[in-house]
Amino acid sequence: MFLKKLLKGSSNSTRPRGATFNGIYTGGDNLSGSSEQNYNNSLTTSTKQTNRQTLLLKSMEYINGSSTYYGNYMDYFDIPVQLFVGGEQSEIYPMLSYNQSLKSLILDFNKITEIPDCITLLPNLNHLSLAANQLTHVPEFLSQLKSLETFEIGINQFTCFPLNVCKIKSLTSLHLETNNIKSLPEEFLNLVNLKDLSLFDNQLKEIPDSLPNNIEKLNLGCNDISSSKSDSLIRISHSLTTLNLSENKIEELDESLSCLVNVKTLMLDCNMIKVIPGSVLGSWKSLVTLNLPHNLISDLPPEVILLSNLRIIDLRGNNFENCKKLIPTESSTPISFKIEDFIQNKERINSLKFDNIEILPTTNSIINSNNNNYEVITTTATTKNIIENKEDNDEKLLNNSTISIVLDSNNKSENNEINENNQLLTTDDDYNTDKNDSFTESEDIIKKIQIELDSIEIQQKQLLLKQIKLKEKMKKEKNKLFKFQQQEIIHQEQLPQSKPENEKLTNIPEQQQKQQQQQQQQEVQQPIITLTKSTSSKVEVEMIVPNQLIFWQSIVPDLIIDKLYLGCRECAMNKSWLKDNNVTHILTVANFKPLYPDLFKYLIINIEDVDEANIYQHFKEMNAFIDEGREKGGVLIHCRAGVSRSASATMAFIMMKNSLKFQEAFDITIKGRPRIYPNIGFINQLKKFEKDLFK
């Protein structure tokens, strides 16, 4: 059938509507109906000419030998015949040849209904993208493409998972966004090479069980998943680094999510999560980016401070009332927040910091407090190492018979409590008692040991404080020395005939310089732990993670007229703000799935932001919906950016409700939201709507 289409298209001078020849579109579906015809008549001649020129520019001739072909938005019904050139002639299709060169074929946003078997004439095809077409199934012969690794078939018409995909064993990346898939077959486990899977915007009710074992990136956003419990996530936790569960219906984070120890990016946007369990969050040691916007969270667990790799955390649209109170109402100056500001349990923060400070005791070290000769105990500044070594260090601390300490001059009395040989009174000989000792004597011994342990703990904290100060001072001096060495190098380059007095000091090898620079970068990226002494003589720990970004102030829509808001898609995500401002209706002028159908009433107008799109036909329906929303509470109108489609819908309502002309409605709308910019096609339709209103 495919060959007949090609032969027919290449021999007839008058081709069927929508046919393709040499990669150029020769005609397509026209708008039908009275509304569409009126709209076409309203377009100016110059606009039509511009559209034809744009269409010609979009067409791309395939150059023989090219490895990539783009044919997006071409209204193709089939794969262009021009691609099958340059190689051995096919026996099945005599007019076509094998193309060994083509490796990437991208035909998104066309009208392809099926994948023809002649695609097997592209044996080295590595990337096939047929997104936004009209596919309903995947043929079995596609598995003959042994080099195919990336397959993109999102935004098609699949009502169930295409089983033949499970036979393409070479796949490493599969994209099936925006279909109607409800589950995954067991055969899907056969794709052992699959690393990147996107099932965004489908109808999954739960996290699928049949996830291949080596998945690294998993996108399950915008489904109907209500439970975060999943055995499959535990099974793939060894490889999983990116997980997207945003725009679902998750209310609780199951303890099984503690398995995500290798995940670096976790997205939980737009769910119904109220609490983040500390035991779960504290397990995400590798986490770099954590997205939690537009949930119902009012408090972060203190364990978040232990995530030493965390650099970005998004908390927008949540219920952090304490942080809201800190913002001055009359100042536009941005306020800087620390992660501790979002944690209510401050005592737990300090406890965690103390518990995760690493003390490494040394042995056989003699301290002379008179001449200030002492040995500095080496510790690590990374929280990761602190946590990993904590238990071992605690055990060493109890077993070691000697310890090195550094004391201030005002702590000499405490120093006297340690004997001259620094022997701790914790050995069996120090507290050897007879079997007939009384119970009272045992209690006294226990108290004595406890006092000794408390004294040691105080000394350790003092030691750590001084040690950190010394390390900071040493770090500064090293930086000074490094800068001095660099200046000397520059100076010697300017005076090539003069020899440096100390060649070892000034002539640093290039490899050594790189190592020093890398070491400095690593030091900057590591968390810094400092101890400070408060006025109450209580030692406090401050843990600072440099370069950490916290997002929590979300974008809100603009009020155009009473009870009518205009904004972008993010504004429609902010359920807390919407509920606080009594919004009951949401008009979405784009192809977006309702996020909170249980909280708000939605009207979805599926229309693209292009000049040719017919928004005029939806004015009546949209105006009635906006009217209803304003009567019951308030209405938000949004598209993707809140600039063109939603702005046009807003102006149409203002024109209808107040009997205003287009320019008057435009002035009102742009005053409330200065960034609006409707496309020329929408403007022409609004002007036509004006004529209809004033007939």
Curated annotation (Swiss-Prot):
EC class name: hydrolase
Record-annotated Tyrosine-protein phosphatase domain positions: 556-695
Any GO molecular function: phosphoprotein phosphatase activity
Gene3D superfamilies for the chain: Protein tyrosine phosphatase superfamily (3.90.190.10), Ribonuclease Inhibitor (3.80.10.10)
Catalysis: reaction(s): O-phospho-L-tyrosyl-[protein] + H2O = L-tyrosyl-[protein] + phosphate; O-phospho-L-seryl-[protein] + H2O = L-seryl-[protein] + phosphate; O-phospho-L-threonyl-[protein] + H2O = L-threonyl-[protein] + phosphate
Region entry Disordered, spans: 413-438, 492-519
Keyword Repeat: yes
Enzyme Commission numbers on file: 3.1.3.16, 3.1.3.48
Role description: Probable phosphatase with dual specificity toward Ser/Thr and Tyr-containing proteins.
UniProt-recorded name of the protein: MAP kinase phosphatase with leucine-rich repeats protein 2
Organism: Dictyostelium discoideum
Lineage, broadest ranks: Eukaryota, Amoebozoa, Evosea, Eumycetozoa, Dictyostelia
